[in-house]
C-alpha cells in the first residue's frame, strides 16, 4: 500500500475513498495538512463500553491521518456523557453513573487503540476542563458568543422542536460544550482539526467560530457521510442487533460474517472505506459480478476483521466459514461444522470447538450461553460445555440460542 505523507494532498485521497462530506475550508485544510504534522481529534461520549461499525468510518479516517504523519487525539466525553448530544435524537439519553462512564471510557479506548497508535497523551477526557468551570464563568467565556436565533436554525435542534419533542436546556447547551471542547483542545494540545459525522456539522462549526471570536487559532472541521447500507439499514446494525467492534460483545466469526454477507451494491464502497487496499484494487474487486463478487466480499471480511481483531482472528473466522458453509448443507438445510476424530479423541469440548471456529468470543461467553439453556445438542441442553464430547456426535445438531443451528460432521 502506498502510504501518503503530510506533504501530499491527503484530502484528495480521503475524498477518493469516500470519507469526506463537508469541510469548513477544503483548500485551507489541504494546505494546513500539507504544511506539516497537525493534531486532529475524534470525540465519543461514553454511552457504551464499546464502539460499533457505525463508528468505524471515523476510526479509519483517523488511521489514514496518522499514517500521513498527523497526530490523533481521542476525546472521551466524560463530562458531556452526563448530558447527551441531542443531534437528531427524539428523546433524552439515560443518565449514567460515574463508575459506568469510566468503564465505558476504558472499553472505548481499547477499541480505538486497535486502529491508531495511542501515546500517553492521546486520550483526553473533557471532564479535565469542564468539571472545573463555573456556570457564570462559562456563560461569560462562551455563551456571549452564541445567538439563540442562530442555534434554533440548526437542523438537529429545529427537527426536534418541529416534531414537538421535548428538548431540555441541558441538552440545548450541548453544542456550546462541544464548541468549548474544540477551543480547549486547541489551547492545550495544539489541535486544529475536528472530525465527525455529518450530524455533527453544526457542533463543529460552532467550535471553529468560537475560536475565531475569541482570537484563537484558525481551526478546521471535516465531516463524514452518514452511512447506510444499500438496503436502507443504518450502518452499525444488523438483523441480530449492533455490530460491535470488541470480541466480548460480538464474536470475530459473526463480525466476519457481517462483512461477508453485505449487499452486493456495497462491496466497492466498503472496501474503499474499511480496507487499506489501493484504489485500483478496490475498483477491480468492486466491479466483479455474480459469483466472482464473493471473492471481493471475502477480501472485505478478512480486511475488516484483521483490523478489528487481528490477523489470527481473521484467518480463524475465514477458515471456520469455509469449514462450516462451503460444503453445502445436509437435507435439513443446516450448515455443517466439521471436526476431526483425532481432535475428538484428545478430549475436545464444545467450548474448545466453538472457540477454535471463532463462533464464540470467549470461554465465559460459552458458559453463559450454556447456563441460560441456549447451548443444545439435538435439543438436549448442555450443562457443562467444558466437558469432553462423548459418544457419537456425527450428525448431531448443535444449537446456539434460537436462531443459530449447525450439523456436526466427523472427519478422519
Curated annotation (Swiss-Prot):
- Name of the top EC class for this enzyme: ligase
Q: Name one GO biological process term.
A: tyrosyl-tRNA aminoacylation
List ligand-binding residues for ATP: 237
Q: Where is this motif: 'HIGH' region?
A: 46-55
Task: Give the residue interval(s) assigned to the motif 'KMSKS' region.
Answer: 234-238
Binding-site residues, L-tyrosine: 41, 174, 178
What GO terms are given for molecular function? ATP binding; RNA binding; tyrosine-tRNA ligase activity
Q: According to the UniProt entry, what is the EC number of this protein?
A: 6.1.1.1
Keywords attached to this entry: Aminoacyl-tRNA synthetase, ATP-binding, Cytoplasm, Ligase, Nucleotide-binding, Protein biosynthesis, RNA-binding
Report the protein's function: Catalyzes the attachment of tyrosine to tRNA(Tyr) in a two-step reaction: tyrosine is first activated by ATP to form Tyr-AMP and then transferred to the acceptor end of tRNA(Tyr).
Family per UniProt? Belongs to the class-I aminoacyl-tRNA synthetase family. TyrS type 1 subfamily.
NCBIfam families attached to this UniProt entry: tyrS
Name under which the protein is recorded: Tyrosine--tRNA ligase
Whose protein is this, by species? Answer: Pseudomonas aeruginosa (strain LESB58)
